[in-house]
């Protein structure tokens, strides 16, 4: 393994090559489609999986086929999933939302950046080689105006973003005609309200009630609108970010593109190393999905990593810097209060959240209340001016199953509920972060506590991991908990990669984490009964029963791995049409036997029916025509 490990220079060169040669790419036998809305510019991208026809009879010389409908699926890849779009990372993506933002007339361009740090970076000629060349002129709300999707929703306004989301959440299921494909088991939604058809008005109503958020900073016009809420599809977040130890700008852009290709609904940039500002600019200008950050990480860098030296002024400057770059949501650890820190003393693993430990250390060293809590209203004012959503961080989340659901965890959660109401006063969108490490029997309480004390604001959890014994497989241990809490009502799940607790994930780790979590959220959507969630499963089952191998590969979340595993034992082209796989072989294939039984039963029914008719014919004397009273 060590013989094939790339050097840092090789890793960067590979990432640079990826970026330089990047082009829109479709999955096997898929094509990009767009569904238009009523608002100008609303063209919702989806991936449509093309399927082969089913053989239904005929002869070898003249076979008869029945067409199978193409299956539309949700697509997070943006322009990177459209082969017709030319990609240029140096220029960034097209500004999809810019006309909608401008048309509202409630923003203004800034002549001077609000952040001292940003102005310093822009004045540094030594950063020219690293800097993204096409910098946007940032906008903010005009004086006295609020520009959040929550504000518009409360005013009764259906924005283009809301219509875009309604179309997207329906996943093109109105295109499906087959009753076999449309069949769906009733879900158990635990109080969630899942309409048969998601309308733009329903989206507006959910956002207005605070049950859902649309992360959409006015300075990130490249992003495609998406929604986070328990009455919608469960979403997945992927974490990327450089560190002081490893990774580079080109590698993080590569991981961003890779993440969106494999289904990340949002991406968090958790960079802690050099060039945080420049890295984030490249990511934002090339991201079709919302970008989140943890601003305290960069604020800490500004004071040389010394938590005690953090100040509100440095943190505020960081918020302005990131808001004007276009960050869509901030994780803020404002619920780590001074009086809660002693509650963690008896824990097995103490405080495991980086942001939580930073704020706990600051509180103890100054013996003062958390300055994020003290200045929370000012944080909300900043967010309202740019439409930055708040992700209220769980700094006291449990880091082991022994510490799950303890006093400190729920004390902080209740405080996050109080902060949610304050944020809503400013029309700021809010979601709540959750654990962590929780055994299966204790997971549901996390959801019920959050709904009750945080007023149904969307829940966003890391897993949770259901056992602590599997380093190297924590994408699996957490995927179990993720599927469960998604079913119970969690709105978004932060992926966990195989490298969790072990190291910084690479591209393959990112893919493994995302596929694991796409499985978890899909299982949750099925269990909740999200309309149309079962269509892809039904299409896969039909293809499997009919031995349409190519369709099985292409319907899979990861077509490449599915094909590779099949071809390990049946690599020949004949294996793609064989009515068996290598598991059972031709004589013991259950589905082949089932088909034979079905054909036999159908033949027997016809034969018995014909025999009955013949006997009836003879009983009536063999007359072709009968008198009316005999018929």
From Swiss-Prot:
E.C. numbers: 4.1.99.17
Alphabetized InterPro entries for the sequence: ThiC, ThiC-associated_dom, ThiC/Bza_core_dom, ThiC/BzaA/B
Subunit architecture: Homodimer.
Biological process per Gene Ontology, one example term: thiamine biosynthetic process
Assigned GO CC terms: cytosol
Function: Catalyzes the synthesis of the hydroxymethylpyrimidine phosphate (HMP-P) moiety of thiamine from aminoimidazole ribotide (AIR) in a radical S-adenosyl-L-methionine (SAM)-dependent reaction.
Note accompanying the cofactor annotation: Binds 1 [4Fe-4S] cluster per subunit. The cluster is coordinated with 3 cysteines and an exchangeable S-adenosyl-L-methionine.
Keyword Zinc attached: yes
Sites where the protein binds [4Fe-4S] cluster: 581, 584, 589
Protein's name according to its UniProt entry: Phosphomethylpyrimidine synthase
Cofactor: [4Fe-4S] cluster
Pfam families in UniProt: ThiC-associated, ThiC_Rad_SAM
Family: Belongs to the ThiC family.
Binding residues for substrate: 239, 268, 297, 333, 353-355, 394-397, 433, 460
Binding, Zn(2+): 437, 501
Entry's Gene Ontology molecular function annotations: 4 iron, 4 sulfur cluster binding; carbon-carbon lyase activity; zinc ion binding
């Amino acid at each position: 393994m060590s013989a094939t490990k790339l050097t840092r220079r090789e890793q960067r060169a590979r990432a640079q090559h990826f970026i330089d040669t990047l082009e829109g790419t479709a999955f096997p036998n898929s094509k990009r489609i767009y569904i238009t809305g009523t608002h100008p510019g609303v063209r919702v991208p989806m991936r449509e999986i093309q399927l082969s026809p089913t053989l239904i009879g005929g002869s070898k010389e003249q076979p008869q086929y029945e067409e199978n409908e193409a299956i539309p699926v949700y697509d997070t890849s943006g322009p990177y999933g459209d082969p017709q779009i030319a990609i240029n990372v140096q220029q960034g993506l097209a500004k999809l939302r810019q006309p909608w933002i401008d048309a509202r007339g409630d923003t203004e361009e800034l002549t001077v950046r609000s952040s001292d740090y940003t102005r310093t970076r822009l004045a540094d000629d030594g950063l020219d080689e690293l800097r993204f060349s096409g910098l946007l002129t940032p906008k903010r709300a005009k004086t006295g105006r609020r520009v959040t999707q929550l504000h518009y929703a409360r005013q009764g306004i259906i924005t283009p973003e809301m219509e875009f989301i309604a179309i997207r959440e329906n996943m093109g299921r109105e295109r499906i005609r087959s009753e076999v494909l449309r069949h769906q088991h009733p879900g158990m939604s635990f109080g969630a309200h899942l309409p048969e058809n998601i309308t733009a008005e329903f989206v507006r109503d959910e956002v207005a009630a605070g049950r859902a958020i649309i992360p959409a900073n006015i300075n990130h016009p490249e992003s495609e609108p998406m929604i986070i809420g328990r009455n919608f599809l469960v979403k997945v977040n992927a974490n990327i970010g450089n560190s002081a130890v490893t990774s580079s700008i080109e590698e993080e852009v590569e991981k961003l593109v890779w993440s969106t290709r494999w289904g990340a609904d949002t991406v968090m940039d958790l960079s802690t190393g050099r060039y945080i500002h420049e890295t984030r600019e490249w990511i934002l200008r090339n991201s079709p999905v919302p970008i989140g950050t943890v601003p305290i990480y960069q604020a800490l860098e500004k004071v040389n990593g010394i938590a005690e030296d953090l100040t509100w002024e440095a943190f505020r400057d960081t918020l302005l810097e990131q808001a004007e770059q276009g960050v869509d949501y901030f994780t803020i650890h404002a619920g780590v209060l001074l009086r809660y820190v002693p509650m963690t003393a008896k824990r097995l693993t103490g405080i495991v959240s980086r942001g939580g430990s930073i704020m706990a250390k600051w509180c103890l060293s100054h013996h003062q209340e958390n300055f994020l809590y003290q200045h929370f209203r000012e944080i909300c004012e900043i967010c309202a001016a740019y439409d930055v959503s708040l992700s209220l961080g769980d700094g006291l989340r449990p880091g082991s199953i022994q510490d799950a659901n303890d006093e400190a965890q729920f004390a902080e959660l209740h405080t996050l509920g109080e902060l949610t109401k304050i944020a809503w006063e400013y029309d700021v969108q809010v979601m709540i972060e959750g654990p962590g490490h929780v055994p299966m029997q204790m997971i549901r309480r996390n959801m019920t506590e959050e709904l009750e004390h945080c007023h149904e604001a969307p829940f966003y959890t890391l897993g949770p991991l259901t056992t602590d014994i599997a380093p190297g497989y924590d994408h699996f241990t957490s995927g179990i908990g993720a599927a469960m809490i998604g079913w119970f009502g969690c709105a978004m799940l932060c992926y966990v990669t195989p490298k969790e607790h072990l190291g910084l994930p690479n591209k393959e780790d990112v893919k493994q984490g995302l596929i694991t979590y796409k499985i978890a959220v899909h299982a949750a959507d099925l269990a909740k009964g999200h309309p149309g969630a079962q269509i892809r499963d039904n299409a896969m089952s039909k293809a499997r029963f009919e031995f349409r191998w190519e369709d099985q590969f292409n319907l899979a979340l990861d077509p490449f791995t599915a094909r590779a595993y099949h071809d390990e034992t049946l690599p020949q082209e004949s294996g793609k049409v064989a009515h068996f796989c290598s598991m059972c072989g031709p004589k013991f294939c259950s589905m082949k036997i089932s088909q034979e039984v079905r054909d036999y039963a159908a033949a027997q029914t016809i034969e018995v029916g014909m025999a009955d008719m013949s006997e009836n014919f003879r009983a009536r004397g063999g007359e072709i025509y009968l008198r009316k009273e005999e018929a």
